[in-house]
Amino acid sequence: MQNELNPILLSQNSIRFATRVAIFFIIRDELVEAVTWRHPVKSMCLGLTITLLYLHPVSFSAILLLVFLTMMPISMTHDVTTNLKDLQNFMASYSSSYDQLLYFRQNYYHHITPSAISSGLLVSLVLIFLLAYLRISIDRYLPIAIWIGLISLHPKLRSYLIQFYSAKRDHVPYLQIRNELAQVWRHVDISGSQTTTRYTSFPKFNPENSVTSLDLVEPPENYSWAPQSDWTFVPPNEFRRFILWSPQPPKMNRKSSHGSNLPL
């Protein structure tokens, strides 16, 4: 219903409209919940709605045209009075729609729970509406990209991808050695009373025998692994372990009365 321009009514509608702009923030919060999969039903409905809007935008054009003509009727004149009247009626229609939406949310929204039955029912209704208008062409890959992006934002997949990326970024040399069985080399550095064995896939000086696993690495001659020591990964591509000096006692020989050498 289109009312004639009235200053008092225009002022009242302006106040009503100013107190009901929270709907835009509510929509923003709902979109955040849908994109981040906090509410799976909203996420599925968002993906289906975007798919339908892309494949068949004409399906929404009739609804948008009806709303536009109802709120903002076409005027043959461009005077200030007509514009103010349209603005007055638009604010009144918006305020009434907001009040009805708020009434539905307060009285009926609690029945739509994220349980299995209600979730399946709501998704099925949207899916049926989508399939009724869906005609996929081979050259339209944007919906597939939209769904891949939406699914990748799921908490489980998102945490898996972040964990995989972090492990790949922080432990690439370690994973490369363990998985590809790359030949690695052992080096010995002597510093003071302790000796450190470095285990790396990039030899920097004369290498010893190559091995394919840390389990096959033996301490240098006359050395043993330090007690309670283990291999430690040192970025970017080294493994280190402490060793201690433990020489084998030399074998001493003695001469018998007949001149032969007898081991002690």
UniProtKB/Swiss-Prot annotation:
Entry keyword annotation includes Membrane: yes
Keyword Plastid attached: no
Entry's localization field: Membrane
GO cellular component terms given for this protein: endoplasmic reticulum; peroxisomal membrane
One Gene Ontology term from the biological process aspect of the record: peroxisome organization
Sequence positions bearing Phosphoserine: 260
Keyword line: Membrane, Phosphoprotein, Transmembrane, Transmembrane helix
Transmembrane segments: 48-68, 112-132, 142-162
Bilayer topology annotation: Multi-pass membrane protein
Entry-linked InterPro entries: Peroxisomal_Membrane_PEX28-32
Entry-linked PANTHER family: PEROXISOMAL MEMBRANE PROTEIN PEX29
Name the UniProt record assigns to this protein: Uncharacterized protein C737.05
Originating species: Schizosaccharomyces pombe (strain 972 / ATCC 24843) (Fission yeast)
